């Protein structure tokens, strides 16, 4: 019997206008994966943060048209992926988008999936490196809202996927023409306590960067992994991207910034990297080049397509695997979705 496949793309979401900034912030900070506290304390904290940060966040979003570009970017990725898959598979399929903290929410998407009436569902996060705060939260929320009994295949991560690495390399090589450049691979930060609790995010970031550096094959390449978007007084992953730009400026080192954990343009890249961090480089009069996110880059879309083809062809159902069909995280990372290796 011919398969009928529902493919769900996960991403963070974002406000569609300035009025929706506050509810977006509340949804974000009310997530137990972000603030792991019991209610009503978590609810109160999320309310306070969403109220106190609303004006500042509105000002930031006003710099990029008063809304997040993430949904539009994801729609474009969905279209590119649909066109590519149509060329390669005979099965019926439909691609759905599920945002975690803004519409389309899981409940709405599941309603659409039920009308489509698939024989199986494949979950594909647009987070290449796994974290319990991103993919983990999205998958958990989707499954909690799912009220039909259906085979599900979950792709937890793809930090070492061949064409994913090649896509990054191709974009970097377009700009890497001077030996004086220092490459900063900038990833979204996480509190240290989340990593210490067994989250494999920083491990997978390192794996991705090492694979890119190996593929670039440049002797004595000057590069660092850095983390951006810190919030609050707690300890976050280090080094901080801002601090490393300052350091490079003092050394008169020109910079190439690679947004290594983002596959779509949104506020962290368009404002934080393109405006705020560039001002630091301008202060020191060093060259500052920002590599674009992968978006609808053909090599990246090929990467996602190849991952989906692998999972479509798997006979096993109710799978949770990395794109390589194995657990890539050492067993110490207990938050990894994949089964522990023996």
UniProtKB/Swiss-Prot annotation:
SUPFAM superfamilies: Chelatase
GO cellular component labels: cytoplasm
Record keywords: Cytoplasm, Heme biosynthesis, Iron, Lyase, Metal-binding, Porphyrin biosynthesis
Protein's UniProt keywords contain Secreted: no
GO biological process: heme biosynthetic process
Pathway: Porphyrin-containing compound metabolism; protoheme biosynthesis; protoheme from protoporphyrin-IX: step 1/1
Record Pfam families: Ferrochelatase (PF00762)
HAMAP family assigned: Ferrochelatase (MF_00323)
UniProt function note: Catalyzes the ferrous insertion into protoporphyrin IX.
Family: Belongs to the ferrochelatase family.
UniProt-recorded name of the protein: Ferrochelatase
UniProt organism field: Rickettsia conorii (strain ATCC VR-613 / Malish 7)
